[in-house]
Design a protein with these regions (language model features):
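Flexible inter-repeat linkers and adjacent short helices
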Residues: 1-2, 16-22, 26-37, 41-134, ...
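Linker/hinge segments immediately adjacent to helix-turn-helix/homeobox DNA-binding domains
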Residues: 186, 210-348, 364
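Tandem amphipathic alpha-helical repeat scaffolds
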Residues: 62-80, 99-113, 134-150, 176-192, ...
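Helix-turn-helix repeat elements of alpha-solenoid scaffolds
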Residues: 73-89, 106-122, 148-163, 188-201, ...
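Helix-turn-helix DNA-binding segment
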Residues: 333-382, 386-391, 397-402
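Solenoid-like repeat scaffolds
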Residues: 89-97, 122-133, 160-174, 200-213, ...
């Protein structure tokens, strides 16, 4: 076999465990953890796009062999049933050390400790075990949005896409396909970037997920329906999910509660929305799971302000700081992919008011909802229009999420 160095358009490398590449009956020695132009990434290694057809079958079989070996689950803490305030104990009960470390990364992420999350999961981004890899990819993607590293987030987002593509092409075991699709939809739906045509529907694989992950996936499904503005149906999906639970899965239930409240506020069921968010907040409080509320702040349209702003001003300030950091990173991925650019000119409270104003809420209704005076709301709305350089409140829809 030849030890000639590969040219940039020929190939690329693997992880430390993949140090050679076979092309046209020649074996090349590769440089670990170096990626060359014109390559694509797969679990455990990279491969050249131009020479891909010559080795596709061999490489994909190796990828799928590694995927089949995994009997782990994706996002183990999301899938854990435990009483609120007992997240640390739930992690301690996970005997698999690597899975426990992923669960610790989840804890850091959901408790809005992005730097600790990234540090905890970074070593799993190239792991041969697809469940560990996908879990790390998701956490790394969203944590880096908060940290203002959109390029790092984009890399792991692409890795999830590639894992999904290969799992589907090679007809991987159904649990692997379900995990890949779950990871893909987590990122796509939260970024409000529609999946490519031909992507299998999420609901087709939800039954193959463990119950906790299944509940979280149902929250994604409801979120997807919400984005189609079918609020009553989305709310019904959430309510059905709560009925099928066999225990307390705090993380999934917090996300379900947020989506339900999003639907309720759009149906002008204000009291119900406030009650739903209050329940979700109480479920999150003991473990300090702030991240769901940071991610859903804008779509909750002022409900967080009603529930937390005056009652817990210090906690609300932490939420606001998190919202600002996360939303800036979110926009750097979302805006280039979509025709409409979501604005970063508004404060979290202004954004909440803007979300209500363009949906034909009157100043009086907004004031009553947020506990503000009508004059204060008028002042905010005028300031929003000025910042966005528009003259009518119905034009706000071009600058915010819907």
């Amino acid at each position: 076999m030849s030890n000639a160095n590969p040219t940039n358009d020929e190939l690329c490398i693997a992880s430390i465990t993949r140090i050679s590449y076979i092309n046209e009956c020649q074996e090349y020695t590769l440089c670990p953890n170096v990626r060359y132009p014109g390559t694509v990434r797969f679990p455990g290694f990279f491969c050249c796009v131009e020479r891909w057809n010559n080795v596709e079958k061999v490489i994909l079989q190796e990828v799928m062999k590694e995927m089949k070996l995994s009997d782990r689950v994706i996002l183990p803490l999301v899938g854990s049933a435990f009483q609120p305030g007992k997240a640390a104990e739930a992690i301690e009960k996970i005997k698999d050390k690597e899975l426990a470390q992923i669960a610790q990364g989840e804890y850091y992420f959901f408790s809005a400790q992005a730097e600790k999350c990234v540090e905890t999961v970074k070593d799993y981004l190239d792991h041969d075990d697809v469940m560990l890899r996908l879990s790390a990819d998701m956490l790394y993607t969203f944590a880096n949005l908060t940290l203002g590293n959109p390029q790092a987030a984009q890399c792991t987002r692409e890795d999830v896409q590639q894992c999904l593509t290969r799992a589907m092409q090679m007809d991987a075991p159904v649990n692997v396909r379900a995990a890949c699709l779950f990871a893909f939809y987590v990122i796509s739906i939260f970024l409000h970037i529609p999946p490519e045509e031909g992507t299998p529907p999420l609901q087709q694989y939800i039954p193959y997920l463990p119950i906790g992950q299944r509940l979280f996936a149902v929250s994604l499904l409801a979120h997807e329906i919400y984005l189609k503005q079918d609020y009553a149906n989305a709310k019904g999906v959430v309510q059905g999910a709560f009925l099928m639970t066999d225990g307390v899965y705090p993380i999934a239930m917090i996300y379900l509660g947020c989506v339900q409240a999003m639907c309720q506020i759009n149906l002008k069921e204000q009291e119900e929305a406030i009650q739903t968010v209050t329940q979700a907040w109480e479920r999150a409080r003991l473990d300090k799971f702030m991240e769901p509320f940071i991610e859903y702040h804008g779509l909750l349209q002022g409900v967080l302000e009603v529930c937390i702003r005056k009652k817990e001003p210090e906690m609300y300030k932490k939420l606001v700081d998190g919202v600002l950091a996360f939303s800036r990173g979110w926009m750097k991925i979302h805006n280039p992919k979509m025709q409409k650019a979501v604005t970063d000119l508004l404060s979290p409270l202004e954004y909440s008011i803007a979300m209500l104003a363009f949906r034909d809420w009157t100043n009086q209704e907004i004031a009553e909802h947020l506990g503000l005076s009508v004059n204060t709301v008028k002042h905010y709305v005028s300031g929003i229009l000025e910042k966005l350089q528009i003259d009518k409140r119905d034009k706000i829809k071009d600058f915010v999420n819907q």
